[in-house]
């Protein structure tokens, strides 16, 4: 089996192939190390290679083992809250607690698997991801052309993502921007930290206070970059950690199984084939709303009005 892709935006080879093939980075690296990837007709064994617009990537699947893991995401019958769907893409309101992509631990239930089932068991492609316990709007493409188009928008910041978070303690400044680079915590495969090192990646988050009291604040956030755990690490850095965050929250806080109170409430982009602006709002989960009420916080307006 052979596949060929024309690159539309500058990106790392392993990151791009992970999206195009619905694979983990680990599995993509195996393909590269096995000599199954060509860039502009030349074999490459460098997973960190930066590919540029109009580069041609060829993937050759020449053994059963590799073919097996290319198609390893099994469809999973799970009811989805579909905010929009057409022949090119879906916008889903992902529930808290659901993996976006299967891990190596053989979980069958994931957003990707559910979308494959919903799409008559045909392949789908993730434009971006949400943490397991982060709920909200996520875009899933039905073809690779739409995927490449939206990933290009993501890199050029014409695809915009907005979140709401319930955080500890009131703010002095009601608006602000957090510009602090992120890197992995040493000897930790899961956690990230603020760092000023060569491996740290630029990360920028804008925030605005919606409502607050002496204990907590409900804030809106816009991602200007899309690093793993970016919002959660940034909010810990400015001493307003997300409520119930198992990784970056207050250690003494009594936590429940819901996970962090972080919700991707809005996503905007240009439709890849219709070429018109699209704007979607994902409602809060009932448990999130209940938590707000328990802290005497409320939305001054519905989310779809507040973030127009």
From Swiss-Prot:
InterPro entries associated with the record: PsdUridine_synth_cat_dom_sf (IPR020103), PsdUridine_synth_RluA-like_CS (IPR006224), PsdUridine_synth_RluC/D (IPR006225), PsdUridine_synth_RsuA/RluA (IPR006145), RluA_PseudoU_synthase (IPR050188), S4_RNA-bd (IPR002942), S4_RNA-bd_sf (IPR036986)
Keywords attached to this entry: Isomerase, RNA-binding
Gene3D superfamilies given in the database record: Pseudouridine synthase, RNA-binding S4 domain
CDD domains per UniProt: PseudoU_synth_RluA_like, S4
GO molecular function, one term: rRNA pseudouridine synthase activity
Sequence ranges assigned to domain S4 RNA-binding in this UniProt record: 11-87
Reaction(s) this enzyme catalyzes, per UniProt: a uridine in RNA = a pseudouridine in RNA
Entry annotated with the keyword RNA-binding: yes
Keyword Cytoplasm: no
PROSITE patterns named in the record: PSI_RLU, S4
Catalytic site: 131
Any GO BP annotation: enzyme-directed rRNA pseudouridine synthesis
EC numbers for this chain: 5.4.99.-
UniProt feature coiled coil, ranges: none
Family (UniProt): Belongs to the pseudouridine synthase RluA family.
PANTHER family (alphabetical): MITOCHONDRIAL RNA PSEUDOURIDINE SYNTHASE, RIBOSOMAL LARGE SUBUNIT PSEUDOURIDINE SYNTHASE D
Name listed for the protein in its UniProt record: Uncharacterized RNA pseudouridine synthase MG209
């Amino acid at each position: 089996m052979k596949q060929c892709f024309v690159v539309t935006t500058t990106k790392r080879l392993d990151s791009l192939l992970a999206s195009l093939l619905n694979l983990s980075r680990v599995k993509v690296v195996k393909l590269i190390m096995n000599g199954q990837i060509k860039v502009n007709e030349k074999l490459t064994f460098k997973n960190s290679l930066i590919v540029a617009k109009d580069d041609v990537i060829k993937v050759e699947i020449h053994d059963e083992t590799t073919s097996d893991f290319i198609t390893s995401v099994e469809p999973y019958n799970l009811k989805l809250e579909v905010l929009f769907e057409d022949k090119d893409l879906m916008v889903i309101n992902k529930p808290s607690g659901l993996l976006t992509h299967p891990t190596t631990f053989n979980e069958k239930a994931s957003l990707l698997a559910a979308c494959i089932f919903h799409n008559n068991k045909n392949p789908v492609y993730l434009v971006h991801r949400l943490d397991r316990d982060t709920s909200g709007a996520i875009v899933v493409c039905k073809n690779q052309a739409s995927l490449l188009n939206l990933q290009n928008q993501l890199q050029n910041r014409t695809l915009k993502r907005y979140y709401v978070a319930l955080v500890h303690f009131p703010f002095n400044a009601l608006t602000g921007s957090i510009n602090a680079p992120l890197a992995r915590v040493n000897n930790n495969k899961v956690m990230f930290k603020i760092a000023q090192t060569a491996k740290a990646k630029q990360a920028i988050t804008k925030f605005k206070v919606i409502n607050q009291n002496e204990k907590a604040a409900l804030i809106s956030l816009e991602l200007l970059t899309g690093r793993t755990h970016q919002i959660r690490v940034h909010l810990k850095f400015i001493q307003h950690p997300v409520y119930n965050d198992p990784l970056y929250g207050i250690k003494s806080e009594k936590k429940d199984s819901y996970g962090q109170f972080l919700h991707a409430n809005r996503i905007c982009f240009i439709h890849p084939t219709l070429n018109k602006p699209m704007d979607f709002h994902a409602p809060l989960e009932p448990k999130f709303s209940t938590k707000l009420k328990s802290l005497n916080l409320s939305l001054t307006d519905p989310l779809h009005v507040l973030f127009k």
